[in-house]
Design a protein with these regions (language model features):
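Flexible "cap/lid" loop of the alpha/beta hydrolase fold
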Residues: 162-167, 173-205
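Alpha/beta-hydrolase fold catalytic core
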Residues: 2-81, 104-106, 147
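Short beta-strand/loop motif that positions the catalytic acidic residue
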Residues: 267-268, 274-276, 280
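Gly/Ala-rich beta-loop-alpha elbow adjacent to hydrolase catalytic centers
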Residues: 153, 157, 161
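Conserved alpha/beta-hydrolase catalytic His-Asp/Glu region
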Residues: 186-192, 202-267
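Active-site loop/oxyanion-hole signature of alpha/beta-hydrolase fold enzymes
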Residues: 55, 62-74, 110-152
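Conserved HGGG/HGGXW glycine-rich cap/lid loop of the alpha/beta-hydrolase fold
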Residues: 67, 72-118
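Alpha/beta-hydrolase-fold catalytic nucleophile elbow
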Residues: 112, 178-179, 215
Length: 281
């Protein structure tokens, strides 16, 4: 993986600056109590759609093989393409407030990963990181995204982005990793050292989402109760798929060592920016 030289830093300035300023907003959506309608599900979806509109995004779908991908697209297709990959138990909407800063200068593509958001897969789907990276490549090809493209990944999305860039180095223009998952020599959190701890973060019953926020945010923001309930309900519904993803991460950690994981990414030659906050877990 290359380090950034001065010329490369200059060429990445717009992408890196916009992403760095915006990434702190991942997974946080500020809404007022007045926006919460009696019908929580309808209100929640309405708010998400309002955020997509505000970010300049349109909801689209694309069938590739046996997967019907749900994704957001914004910006002119004549601009450089930027692929944003969400994290574990997340969805494309985690990037809405980030995308707001990007759609003016980039062709932004944000898919729901298989088993997340509105991208539905079969019960026997292989949730391994290598397979997710391969399926993502098939999506990029079917969407006719002209490479090389910029790729940003958060959490699990960072692991997928790493493998994608390693397998398709000539199709990757730059790489931006936010709190990336993976198997590293200098892992500094319990979740990277031992993914079994991720099971503690599964949202499978009422009350779990509050625990998740406390564990994953240094200073959790105020979120109206109606929004919390709607988000928790969605995550409970997706708990079986999230459990399978966690199981695959645990299996990956047993199969690969830091050295063997590094081999998977040794062909990455794209300029890479890694962001990890002081309090991030």
């Amino acid at each position: 993986m290359t380090r950034l030289s001065a010329p490369i830093k200059a060429s990445m300035k717009k992408t890196a600056t916009a992403l760095t300023l915006a990434c702190s907003l991942l997974s946080v959506m500020s809404i007022s109590q007045a926006q919460a309608a009696d019908n929580i599900d309808v209100s929640f979806q309405t708010i998400l759609q309002q955020e997509r509109n505000w970010a300049g995004l349109q909801s689209k779908s694309l069938k590739v093989g046996d997967i019907t991908w749900s994704y957001s697209e914004g910006g002119s297709s004549t601009k450089p393409t930027l692929l944003l990959i969400h994290g574990l138990a997340g969805s494309r909407d985690n990037w809405n407030r980030v995308a707001h800063y990007l759609t003016t200068n980039y062709h932004v593509i944000i898919p729901d990963l298989p088993g997340s958001g509105e991208t539905i897969v079969s019960q026997d789907f292989d949730y391994s990181v290598p397979n997710l990276a391969e399926k993502l490549r098939r999506f990029v090809e079917a969407a006719n995204l002209k490479g090389p493209i910029h790729i940003a990944g958060h959490s699990l999305g960072g692991s997928i982005a790493l493998l994608y860039a390693g397998q398709y180095p000539f199709e990757t223009k730059s790489l931006f990793l936010v709190d990336s998952g993976g198997i590293f020599r200098s892992a500094n959190t319990i979740y990277l050292k031992d993914p079994t701890y991720l099971k503690q973060l599964l949202v499978s019953k009422k009350g779990d989402f509050n625990y998740l926020l406390k564990q994953t945010m240094f200073n959790p923001p105020f979120i109206p109760k109606e929004f919390l309930q709607a988000q928790e309900k969605l995550m409970i519904n997706q708990a079986p798929q999230t459990q399978k993803l966690v199981d695959q991460l645990i299996a990956l950690n047993k199969v690969y060592t830091p050295d063997s994981f590094a081999v998977l990414t040794k062909t990455i030659d794209a300029p890479t920016l890694i962001l990890w906050g002081k309090q991030d877990k």
